[in-house]
A protein has these predicted regions:
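Beta-strand-rich extracellular modules
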Residues: 102-106
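N-terminal onset of structured domains
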Residues: 1-56, 63-67, 77-78, 87-94, ...
Length: 125
């Protein structure tokens, strides 16, 4: 049976706004990422989660807006660049984390993961 989830990491995401470590636990984190896409009329989404220093997902420490709003930047032309904005996130516990940003495109029968990246952050009390 074919899976509706496939991964193709061709276009890298460019992080244009990210937190500067160290940050205090509970402080608002803003992240902006740009991604070049071939289909400007597609339906795109991005999601954030927290990983520990070993790359294992840590549930419950990253709070707030974990799904990004997005907008096209050049009017729907081919080779569009879209911008994902995470404006209201925070990490509730001190420690060393990676914030993983994953971008997806909705397709018939599911979603395709387009790319992912991580941002290292040190969180203090």
């Amino acid at each position: 049976m074919a899976s509706s989830y496939t991964m193709s990491f061709s276009p890298p995401m460019q992080i244009t706004t990210k937190p500067q470590s160290p940050i205090k636990s509970g402080t608002n984190i803003k992240i902006t990422a740009k991604l070049a896409v071939a289909d400007p009329t597609g339906n795109y989404m991005a999601h954030a989660d927290a990983l520990d220093a070993n790359g294992q997902e840590v549930n419950g420490v990253l709070k707030g807006q974990l799904a990004a709003s997005w907008e096209p930047t050049n009017g729907g032309n081919a080779a569009e660049t879209i911008v994902f904005k995470f404006d209201r996130m925070n990490i509730s516990e001190p420690g060393s984390y990676q914030i993983r940003i994953q971008a997806y495109k909705q397709v018939a029968g599911g979603i395709n993961q387009l790319t992912k990246t991580t941002i290292l952050v040190q969180v203090i009390a």
